[in-house]
Structures are given as C-alpha cells and as structure tokens.
Amino acid sequence: GVPINVKCTGSPQCLKPCKDAGMRFGKCINGKCHCTPK
C-alpha cells in the first residue's frame, strides 16, 4: 500500500482519506493509513 499522512486506530477510518487521495481502500498500519492505488 501507499502510506498517506493520516493517523488511524482502525482500518475503517482509512476508507474516506484513501478515497479522497484518489485511491481505493486502505488499512491502518502502525497508526497510519496505507492506501491501495487504483
């Protein structure tokens, strides 16, 4: 995944930030969102 500068405690929190970044969905890894490119 592509790390973005968004803090998280759970993967659902990364859905919108990843979408806003033009990517698909994300996982929360080490407290930061990692997104999947389209």
Curated annotation (Swiss-Prot):
UniProt-recorded name of the protein: Potassium channel toxin alpha-KTx 3.4
Subcellular location: Secreted
Any one GO molecular-function label of the UniProt entry: ion channel inhibitor activity
Entry domain remark: Has the structural arrangement of an alpha-helix connected to antiparallel beta-sheets by disulfide bonds (CS-alpha/beta).
InterPro entries with a match to the protein in the record: Scorpion_toxin-like_sf, Scorpion_toxinS_K_inh
Primary role: Potent inhibitor of the Shaker potassium channel (Ki=0.16 nM) and its mammalian homologs (Kv1.3/KCNA3 (Ki=1.7 nM), Kv1.1/KCNA1 (Ki=136 nM), Kv1.6/KCNA6 (Ki=149 nM)).
Misc note: Negative results: does not block Kv2.1/KCNB1 (Ki >2000 nM).
Intrachain S-S bonds: 8-28, 14-33, 18-35
